[in-house]
């Protein structure tokens, strides 16, 4: 399993994939890029997280997330985790 930094994580999301961090405490969390459509209230793309409970909420990166090099695509874990 190859890990990478936030820049590559963004590229994965721009290609429609989901990413997660090995350092996150909760298993099953991942982030993904949402591109609004005509029905959306949002007008620009944004990143959201799927939480351990399965809730979807907008996501903001912490300093630790930005500098981390333990990002992986969820395909490496056998799909969305």
For each feature predicted by the language model, list its residue ranges.
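Catalytic phosphate/metal-binding cores of nucleic-acid and nucleotide-processing enzymes, i.e., regions
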Residues: 1-32, 39-44, 48-55, 63
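Short, compact, well-ordered microdomains
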Residues: 49-81
């Amino acid at each position: 399993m190859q890990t990478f930094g936030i820049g590559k994580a963004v590229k994965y999301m721009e290609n429609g994939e989901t990413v997660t961090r090995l350092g996150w405490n909760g298993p099953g969390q991942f982030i993904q890029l949402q591109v609004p459509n005509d029905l959306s209230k949002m007008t620009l793309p944004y990143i959201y997280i799927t939480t351990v409970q399965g809730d979807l909420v907008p996501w903001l990166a912490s300093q630790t997330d930005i500098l981390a090099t333990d990002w992986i695509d969820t395909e490496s874990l056998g799909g969305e985790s």
